[in-house]
Amino acid sequence: MTKQFTMEDRFNPSAVEQALYQHWESRGYFKPSEDINAPSYCIAIPPPNVTGSLHMGHAFQQTLMDTLIRFNRMEGNNTLWQTGTDHAGIATQMVVERKIAAEEGKTRHDYGREAFINKIWDWKAYSGGTISQQMRRLGNSIDWDRERFTMDEGLSNAVKEVFVRLHEEGLIYRGKRLVNWDPKLHTAISDLEVENKESKGSLWHFRYPLANGAKTAEGLDYLVVATTRPETMLGDTAVAVHPEDERYQSLIGKTVVLPLANREIPIIADEYVDREFGTGVVKITPAHDFNDYEVGKRHGLPMVNVMTLNADIRAEAEIIGTDGKPLAGYDAPIPADYQGLERFVARKKIVADFEALGLLDQIKPHDLKVPYGDRGGVPIEPMLTDQWYVSVKPLAEVATKAVENGEIQFVPKQYENLYFSWMRDIQDWCISRQLWWGHRIPAWYDEQGNVYVARDEAEVRSKYGLTSDVALKQDEDVLDTWFSSGLWTFSTLGWPEQTKELKMFHPTDVLITGFDIIFFWVARMIMFTMHFIKDENGKPQVPFKTVYVTGLIRDEQGQKMSKSKGNVLDPIDMIDGISLEDLLEKRTGNMMQPQLAEKIAKATRKEFEHGISAHGTDALRFTLAALASNGRDINWDMKRLEGYRNFCNKLWNASRYVLTHEKLDLSEGEAEYSLADRWIESQFNRTIDAFRTALKQYRFDLVANTIYDFTWNQFCDWYLELTKPVFAHGTDAQKRGTSRMLLNILEKLLRLAHPIIPFITEEIWQKLKGVMKLSGDTIMLQPFPHAEESKFDPVAESQMDWLKEVIVAVRNIRAECNISPSHALELLLRNISEETKICLENNRTLLQSMAKLSTITLLDANEEPPLSVTKLVENNEIFIPMAGFINKEQELTRLTKEIEKLKGEIVRIENKLSNEAFITKAPEQVIAKEREKMQGYLDNIEKLQQQYQAIETL
């Protein structure tokens, strides 16, 4: 047959990928159908923050998602990958604030709320566009017409609906409680936004005088209180000891005089106190410490707030009861000397004043963790502020049961324990933030401070019967970003409207996310979804059936990637490549800490001396899938990326060999299939089976390795080579059989690999389509291969394994003895079974061609070969006569190594057989098999030793 056409020598991703993607998108291949009865499959993407661009973690998770989406689309499921971005309140507001400060020298207050928010919308339009273009470059098969943003009108309506309903159910309330307060950004922040930094600090031991003549067991008239935060002592409302601490039991219920403030506070007993810490006596400051806050609630202590929102000492303390309301009748004046002082200035003065009064007992060095706001960059302050809260316990109970009873499964399973530990000890959730960017809280206040909650002001007036002359002002605060994110799976499908999409695609199938947001996002999605979404029988619906938890992508040294470390890798640079100069600019430009630039530049030059070369999207995706071992962090590996680029080239070259082969015969007529044809078909069907099993278990690494192993090690390295003798010497029927098998396996292999490497598989498939006269416009809508058990052929596999081992043995002898491939060798075989003889006769031409043999001769059992190099394949002896080209010393060394290797195997089996535990537990047939193996090794050693002696006498 004449050549079909020409194919480029190498696959060029940059010439193919973007054009292919535009074609896919324009043809609507990513869209689900409107068929409400079709089996559906849906993934909701974790929405990237609109603040910037995608990083390697996004590329990693999105590759896994797209693999599942493409697979399910090929399986015939009505498939939706719901995408969008998150408004990321505090992060986005800070980016834009920094931008206007740098470019215009202005603050948000110079703009005012409305104008500043318009600035953020402009930024969102720019940044969101960048993210969606990057996602296209990754090959993500997303329905872009359904792209959502957490502050879209539809999603905003869902947020208001949830807030109002929860408020009406008594599950949202406003109260004064302790929160993480960022004194620089002037907002409450979540635990996720708090970074605990190791710090060398001090433990101050202060003397608090006992009141009313009381004495300790040692006769002292004071208690020594240990603290790491002297600046909060003006707000102390008790000192606490452990109830079983005998040193202080007699003092429980008595009082001390709080130094500097000169007021009496009680000595209380609480099991929270660690008897071993400091002196076993701690000060309790409920308004400025989370643990003290809980102690205060247990003991009904007043909360004395001594700090402003700037973290300066107040002129007048704010005194709050345990109910969160102002407390009358408790006096806690702040001495004038401290009023207005910044907190750390106040700390120094308080310590100095204790010393001047003779009340500073001692100062000890102390290692501690100081909580910092991860964006404001200053120590956060536990602060009593008015905030909105969700009472989540009732929601958490339902959400916990969903995981307990298996409605939702975590992969890997160990993350369920992390989920349970959080959910079973859940606290009310502070949902308000003192920001401008975000969902404004749907609550209004009249001039008397009464609060009205509704979806908008018009509804407030009708719901509460307020006339137009009643002035109303909306709450200034916005909702925590996680509040709107928690509605993501159903709000993006049109809720609160009962849409067709909601019916078709909810619950979604799997969520792929990082372990660090299991509580902050995953748990809240489960709680909100099960509270608001019910099936037709009124049963709470889960947001997804499986949560697949990924590890982090770290750099090659195992370090977390971060801008400050200068080790961030951009997935687009892996695809397109980047020069060293541009990489240096990217890593050191616009740094928050410019002093690190030189160190980062040096490390970058060392690691990427010539920049990063282009690898294409498929190589990046294949690498990410291959590295995805369950739940573990991943160290990025450029060598693996290069290796998988080579893999893509290998697939391209194999396809080129097939499609441009001048003897490819697709004519009608009888076809005869060779042993190699039957073997590759059997191996391929086992590969399909292994792929499906691995994907079902979310073992993306095994999925990738399965494709790699078959393509490289079986199809390319063996089968393509095995076709050459057929095309050279076979009958027409044999050529037709091999031609059909080549094309059939290649076409199915492209379909098998398509979910992970979509571009190269589509490009080759389009070329193959014409040759094979296939119907269909795109590979992505072709059916995914199913394993056909009828094609499993253990006999062909066994025979082919034997032939391959013989070929490898002969090739190894050539290499070890430095014999040219052009020199045809004689092959002598001894100790061959009747079954193997038949296999040999049927495949003699193939074996001669593949191993480059002049003759193949069978020896009788007792027939001695001429002086030869010997190899063993199973129990078969292989001899290559060495007359004229043996290197005696080299051959003796090789035999010695072979004998030592077998002796090692014998020692291993002897150890096993002398192990009582093994002998007791192992089945009899396993023990018999080990003994049989050992005897085989002993026989082989004897034969090799005879060979050694024969060569030694040369």
From Swiss-Prot:
Gene Ontology cellular component annotations, sorted alphabetically: cytosol
Top EC category: ligase
Gene3D superfamilies: HUPs, Isoleucyl-tRNA Synthetase, Domain 1, Valyl-tRNA synthetase, C-terminal domain, Valyl/Leucyl/Isoleucyl-tRNA synthetase, editing domain
HAMAP family: Val_tRNA_synth_type1
Subunit structure: Monomer.
Family affiliation: Belongs to the class-I aminoacyl-tRNA synthetase family. ValS type 1 subfamily.
Function: Catalyzes the attachment of valine to tRNA(Val). As ValRS can inadvertently accommodate and process structurally similar amino acids such as threonine, to avoid such errors, it has a 'posttransfer' editing activity that hydrolyzes mischarged Thr-tRNA(Val) in a tRNA-dependent manner.
Name of the featured protein: Valine--tRNA ligase
Organism name: Histophilus somni (strain 2336) (Haemophilus somnus)
Lineage: Bacteria, Pseudomonadati, Pseudomonadota, Gammaproteobacteria, Pasteurellales
Gene name of this polypeptide: valS
